[in-house]
Amino acid sequence: MSDENPLQPPWLNAPPVDSYPYEESHDLRTGPKLHPTLDGLLPYIGVWRGRGRGGYPTIEDFDFAQEIRISHDGRPFLCYESRAWLLDEQSRPIRPAGREMGWWRPVLDGDRATNEWEALMSTPTGVMELHLGKRTGTQLEFATDAVVRTPTAKEVTAGHRLFGIVEGALLYAQEMAAVGHGLTPHLSARLIRVGG
């Protein structure tokens, strides 16, 4: 008769595992080969850093700095990570600001990418957004299809984002519908490539 407890999961006493064995890269010169369905977003892959301006009817306008990292691991999606920090009038950091994680995925027709894209975006403030959009050249435009919030999150009901690569820089504008307001400009920034 076995000494194993049938109610105990088999991994409970298993030895530790090594670190994650697969590479993720924001640099197309190293790491895994880019999945062919992502070729249309190749210019976005990298680490971007720059400045922007934000505001909303319920808050004062503010200046911020931001770093965006767009990477891949060889599969048919991109990983999007963003972190921002507020700046004072002399461009000195004041405090951390928005953070966001997400994934950009092409809509496929068989095994080929179309110009349609899906984006899943999540913030630590309890808001998750599902965006649907299209790529035109080096421009991506997304609009929310659904917004999910935790019970304690601020009321966000819709969003619209426009990204573009212009003269080698990453530019974006973001509109948000929240706390009783319709879609209203919220953030815009210009970031330059610092890695990748």
Curated annotation (Swiss-Prot):
It comes from the Bacteria. The lineage of its organism: Bacteria, Bacillati, Actinomycetota, Actinomycetes, Micromonosporales. Keywords: Heme, Iron, Isomerase, Metal-binding. Pathway: Nitrogen metabolism. Belongs to the nitrobindin family. CDD domains: lipocalin_heme-bd-THAP4-like. Binds 1 heme b group per subunit, that coordinates a highly solvent-exposed Fe(III) atom. Disulfide bonds: none annotated. This is Peroxynitrite isomerase. One of its GO terms (molecular function) is heme binding. Its EC number is 5.99.-.-. It comes from Salinispora tropica (strain ATCC BAA-916 / DSM 44818 / JCM 13857 / NBRC 105044 / CNB-440). It catalyses: peroxynitrite = nitrate. The keyword Cytoplasm does not apply. A motif (GXWXGXG) lies at residues 46-52. Gene3D superfamilies: 2.40.128.20. Homodimer. Heme b binds at residue 186. Heme-binding protein able to scavenge peroxynitrite and to protect free L-tyrosine against peroxynitrite-mediated nitration, by acting as a peroxynitrite isomerase that converts peroxynitrite to nitrate. Therefore, this protein likely plays a role in peroxynitrite sensing and in the detoxification of reactive nitrogen and oxygen species (RNS and ROS, respectively). Is able to bind nitric oxide (NO) in vitro, but may act as a sensor of peroxynitrite levels in vivo. The keyword Isomerase applies. Transmembrane segments: none annotated. Forms a 10-stranded antiparallel beta-barrel structure able to accommodate a hydrophobic ligand in its interior. In fact, this fold hosts the heme group, which is located in a wide surface cleft. Its cofactor is heme b.
